[in-house]
């Protein structure tokens, strides 16, 4: 079920402060965040966030198409190594 419209998008408070500070500075550096649950807002467009996936921070450059999505969607937490090979097929 989607979030109620009257509540508005969820964003952690510290994330807004970090984004404002990054907008004010001239240096473009990766903003490290742990909040995968926060919604991407229009004021984040053009910034690069390091979204934590449980092991490391994955750099995510925010574009117009990402607005309204969550940060966690762009930082996968699981790695797929493929299914086990069929032993019968290898013998031939």
Curated annotation (Swiss-Prot):
Protein S19 forms a complex with S13 that binds strongly to the 16S ribosomal RNA. Belongs to the universal ribosomal protein uS19 family. It comes from the Bacteria. Keywords: Ribonucleoprotein, Ribosomal protein, RNA-binding, rRNA-binding. GO terms for molecular function: rRNA binding; structural constituent of ribosome. One of its GO terms (biological process) is ribosomal small subunit assembly. The gene is rpsS. Gene3D superfamilies: 30s Ribosomal Protein S19, Chain A. It holds the Pfam family Ribosomal_S19. This is Small ribosomal subunit protein uS19. GO terms for cellular component: cytoplasm; small ribosomal subunit.
């Amino acid at each position: 079920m989607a979030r109620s419209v009257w509540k508005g998008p969820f964003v952690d408070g510290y994330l807004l402060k970090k984004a404002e500070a990054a907008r004010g500075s001239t240096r473009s550096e990766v903003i490290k965040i742990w909040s995968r649950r926060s919604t991407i807002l229009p004021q984040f467009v053009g910034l690069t966030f390091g979204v934590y996936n449980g092991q490391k921070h994955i750099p995510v450059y925010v574009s117009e198409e990402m607005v309204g999505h969550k940060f966690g969607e762009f930082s996968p937490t699981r790695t797929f190594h493929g299914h086990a090979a069929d032993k019968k097929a290898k013998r031939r």
